[in-house]
Amino acid sequence: MSVISMKQLLEAGVHFGHQTRRWNPKMKKYIFTERNGIYIIDLQKTVKKVEEAYNFVRELAGNGGKILFVGTKKQAQESVKEEAERCGMFYVNQRWLGGTLTNFATIQKRIKRLREIEKMEEDGVFDVLPKKEVIGLKKEKERLEKFLGGIKDMKELPDALFVIDPRKERIAVAEARKLNIPIIGIVDTNCDPDEIDYVIPANDDAIRAVKLLTSKIADAVLEAKQGEEAAVAAE
């Protein structure tokens, strides 16, 4: 049985690409036709590509690999957080901080600072500090949590990136490529597929399309984890 059906993809509007004037010719092989000035994505290819990405993620997660979900555009923020949390992986759904991967040690320092403030709050230190100082610390914590909350448990570099709209996330893509971290991407008709290892040709602007495809990546992780649990139980 295939991982995803044509019906699911159609209902979520995965086939709607961008306007024909905003396209990347490298995406030509994934385009089925043009309708009313919009490119229509070949969903048979999307089905196949979802399957390839799913198998890669399942195998990676089955070997203990970690995946970082990245989607900072409005249409992706909620799905990225929900699905990454559902499968126990990491995410960035606000601004990508330059150096998140290539300057990992510095990012870890910021995470350490976030943990310090959290501990101060838990230990009741806030109760004995001047009110003004507490307000400042709470603001700092909020800001750090906003940008780093989804990666605060990420102790080392991820084994793969799952990116929604590589054009929007070009800094994340460039950092992953520099470090040879494989990238799975939801790639619309205006993107460059050559930068992505596992291309999922799809509409990256519709919330339902993004949710559907992101949930499939999370499902692959969960299937791998269930397989691990079953293997442990069998032992």
From Swiss-Prot:
GO terms for biological process: translation. The keyword Ribosomal protein applies. One of its GO terms (cellular component) is cytosolic small ribosomal subunit. One of its GO terms (molecular function) is structural constituent of ribosome. InterPro entries: Ribosomal_uS2, Ribosomal_uS2_bac/mit/plastid, Ribosomal_uS2_CS, Ribosomal_uS2_flav_dom_sf. The keyword Ribosomal protein applies. Keywords: Ribonucleoprotein, Ribosomal protein. Gene3D superfamilies: Glucose-6-phosphate isomerase like protein, domain 1, Helix hairpin bin. Belongs to the universal ribosomal protein uS2 family. PANTHER family: 30S RIBOSOMAL PROTEIN S2 PROKARYOTIC AND ORGANELLAR, SMALL RIBOSOMAL SUBUNIT PROTEIN US2M. This is Small ribosomal subunit protein uS2.
